[in-house]
């Protein structure tokens, strides 16, 4: 477990493919999706928070701090990341989206061990980059704030500009599958053998 890293679950998106429903709160076997992500992250970091712009009371039932975007326009994962960097009391922050419940149990460890001297690192499955699963140093906050103020929204471009290191989790493509639709959620529930309470 990494005490020097705060873990932030990104749950602030619009969830257009879920019909605008708050993706992190979709129930799978009677448990909200974000709780599966939370239980995966909990052994990896000592401090956690949730980045959310809607239904904050429901996310607050987790007992974790809820962090709102500092920008009012739903400007994508980067806005949640900026809020997370400003919230954290630790120097480093790891981000995971609320819809990737199988992300590697070694995610934080590998990003931390392999970042080298970089101020940021993000996951790749060997074929595709997964920039929302990323480790960032809080000193990147001013640069990110400026980037968003210019109207920029592309996460990958920001990470490249920050000199982020890509960390490969080879052969773990399935670990990075995100649940975009209700059908995805149902399929995942069946794969895991989860039954409705």
Swiss-Prot record:
Instruction: Specify whether NAD is a keyword of the entry.
Output: no
EC number(s) per UniProt? 2.7.7.77
Q: Partners and quaternary state?
A: Monomer.
Print the keywords alphabetically. Answer: Cytoplasm, GTP-binding, Magnesium, Metal-binding, Molybdenum cofactor biosynthesis, Nucleotide-binding, Transferase
Q: What's this protein's family per the entry?
A: Belongs to the MobA family.
Name it.
Answer: Molybdenum cofactor guanylyltransferase
Among InterPro entries, the record links this protein to:
MobA-like_NTP_Trfase, Molybde_CF_guanTrfase, Nucleotide-diphossugar_trans
Give the Gene Ontology MF terms in alphabetical order.
Answer: GTP binding; metal ion binding; molybdenum cofactor guanylyltransferase activity
